Amino acid sequence: MIIRPVVRSLQGRAPLATLRSAQSVFQPLPQLRRNASVTTGPDAASKASTTPIARITTTTEAPKDQKKAKAAAAAAAEPEEQEVIMSRMPRSLEALYLQPLRREAEYGVPSCDLQLRSYSIRNLEFFCDFALRAAYYLGLPAFGPVPLPRMIERWTVPKSHFIFKKSQENFERVTLRRLIQIKDGHPETVQLWLAFLQKHAYYGIGMKANVWEFSKLGVSKAMDESKSEVEKLLETRWEHLSHVSDMKGVGNFEDFLAKERLRISGGR
């Protein structure tokens, strides 16, 4: 409907009224007002053009400042509730996530050196942590674990036999080591600690312990006195060294062999 008067005007047939109405459609829109007015009343339209933008921004940002002030006042009023964090786990379970506790050595005299070896770093660190916790609960001052130099072993072997014997392959094995030292420990407590680690040994872990015991002067006399006690204990053990306990002398040995031959052959 709008295109037809425009085409007629181009041909000189359309009246002027239609031209004016068509031109009024394409007139530009009035300029929009960019400043908003906050006041209300009959003079609002006159003041709207003079209202600055900065004044509007301050009025809109005022609630944000009030919220920040309220949050700061609430944080200042209750500082202790935010700092204190209560754990719901038992202490025995929470201790697994913390470093193992340690005892302090009074004199610093070494009593045991425990060396742990493994091919897996994960198993080694786990068992070192277990050994340190066990030493703490036994009252032993433990130090470590100290990383020792690695032991690297390599082998070159034929890959196969027959026609493939010229092709070779290399193998490498790395042994990781850690050292835990016990100071100022009682010999019986150290033996109890080592026995506990042997009882609850972890797979893939090798242990080697060097234990020092301090005794009084005149150790040879104490060893001579204990010799007689050891002999009495061994008298009952010597009987178990032979598989036949009732064999008394050499004279009955021939009779014993004859009876065994008859028994094995079935009386033939």
UniProtKB/Swiss-Prot annotation:
GO terms for molecular function: structural constituent of ribosome. Pfam families: Ribosomal_S10. It is found in: Mitochondrion. GO terms for cellular component: mitochondrion; small ribosomal subunit. Keywords: Mitochondrion, Ribonucleoprotein, Ribosomal protein, Transit peptide. Residues 1-64 form a transit peptide. Belongs to the universal ribosomal protein uS10 family. Component of the mitochondrial ribosome (mitoribosome), a dedicated translation machinery responsible for the synthesis of mitochondrial genome-encoded proteins, including at least some of the essential transmembrane subunits of the mitochondrial respiratory chain. The mitoribosomes are attached to the mitochondrial inner membrane and translation products are cotranslationally integrated into the membrane. This is Small ribosomal subunit protein uS10m. It comes from Neurospora crassa (strain ATCC 24698 / 74-OR23-1A / CBS 708.71 / DSM 1257 / FGSC 987).
